[in-house]
């Protein structure tokens, strides 16, 4: 994800410098397509190989069982987080840090409330669910800010 974000960040900065909305749209479309392939690939690989990697890291059955129980959250993580991380880089490339600040403000409040509620009902599953839901919320918020990028190209 970092490589995709780094390339997108520099190309978005170039689009802003030239005030080229078409380049912005192209970078966004291509980056999201590449990201979709990455998300599917990494999630499938993690699902298929989770037992191998868990057993490679520990030979304690109780630790392996716990890791296996919570591995679904690691498989879901790229699905929840990658779009937000890509858009975070794009907003940084344009210099639109207000959107990032606003997203982080909402995400921190959401995380605090969500973990208090979900951990009391679901225990450790609650914190893992909170973690993924917070990343998903960050992605959604940054998607909602996409129309505001057009002001940089007038």
Pin down the residues of each PLM region.
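Alpha-helical transmembrane segments of multi-pass membrane proteins
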Residues: 1, 61-87, 102, 112-113
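Small-residue-rich hydrophobic transmembrane alpha-helices
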Residues: 1-48, 83-95, 99
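Transmembrane alpha-helix boundary/anchor motif
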Residues: 7, 44, 48-52, 85-86, ...
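Membrane-interface helix-loop junctions in multi-pass transport and translocation proteins
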Residues: 17, 65, 108-140, 144-147, ...
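Short helix-capping/hinge motifs at transmembrane helix termini and TM-loop junctions
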Residues: 17, 49-51, 58-60, 93-96, ...
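Hydrophobic residues within alpha-helical transmembrane segments
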Residues: 33-37, 41, 73-76, 102-110, ...
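Short membrane-interface helical motifs at transmembrane helix boundaries
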Residues: 41-68
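Alpha-helical transmembrane segments and their helix-entry boundary regions
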Residues: 97-101, 127-128
């Amino acid at each position: 994800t970092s490589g995709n974000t780094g390339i997108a960040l520099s190309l978005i900065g170039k689009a802003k410098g030239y005030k080229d909305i078409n380049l912005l749209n192209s970078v966004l479309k291509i980056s999201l397509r590449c990201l979709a392939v990455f998300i599917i690939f990494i999630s499938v690989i993690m699902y298929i190989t989770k037992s191998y990697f868990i057993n490679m890291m520990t030979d304690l059955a109780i630790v392996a069982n716990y890791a296996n129980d919570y591995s679904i959250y690691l498989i879901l993580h790229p699905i929840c987080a990658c779009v937000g991380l890509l858009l975070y880089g794009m907003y940084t490339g344009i210099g639109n840090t207000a959107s990032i600040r606003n997203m982080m403000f909402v995400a921190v409040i959401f995380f605090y409330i969500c973990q208090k509620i979900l951990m009391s009902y679901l225990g450790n599953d609650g914190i893992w669910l909170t973690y993924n839901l917070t990343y998903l919320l960050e992605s959604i918020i940054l998607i909602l800010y996409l129309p505001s990028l057009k002001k940089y190209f007038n």
